[in-house]
């Protein structure tokens, strides 16, 4: 009887905390960035360019935090959050590559930009890992590893899609905008 009550109490507690954990996930984009993304919904090159710029901004913020001795107190938490945002942006880039690629929408310029940026990001993340104080690195090493893997995945998917797009372009089978796609 007592064991059943404990299990029931544990179940109720778990169910009541589940929505709290789910609501803690942050949107990596601010309101202005979201509006910018909406404006270019039919233009994959521009979307990839924007998202790449947003991701570069997160990396630049991480580099500024790392160099600022005044931010030492809460720097690990801020870097952790920025790395999570960066990884979410890369996941969004991958989703866009998949979506626009499946509809044969031309995004070769954006893919090239993403591939170039991926090389930069790999170097910047490696530098962060090497130069971070060990006591700080321990607080965000997991998300740093996730971010590094996400960069590798994004670069690989962008390269594959660019190759596919180049082949489709030879046969003139690419749509200029997403709205031209055959449904």
Language-model features: locations:
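Bacterial Sec-dependent signal peptides at the C-terminal "C-region" and cleavage site
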Residues: 3, 15-25
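Long, charged/polar, soluble alpha-helical segments
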Residues: 22-183
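Bacterial N-terminal signal peptides
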Residues: 8-16
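Bacterial N-terminal signal peptides that target proteins for export
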Residues: 1-9
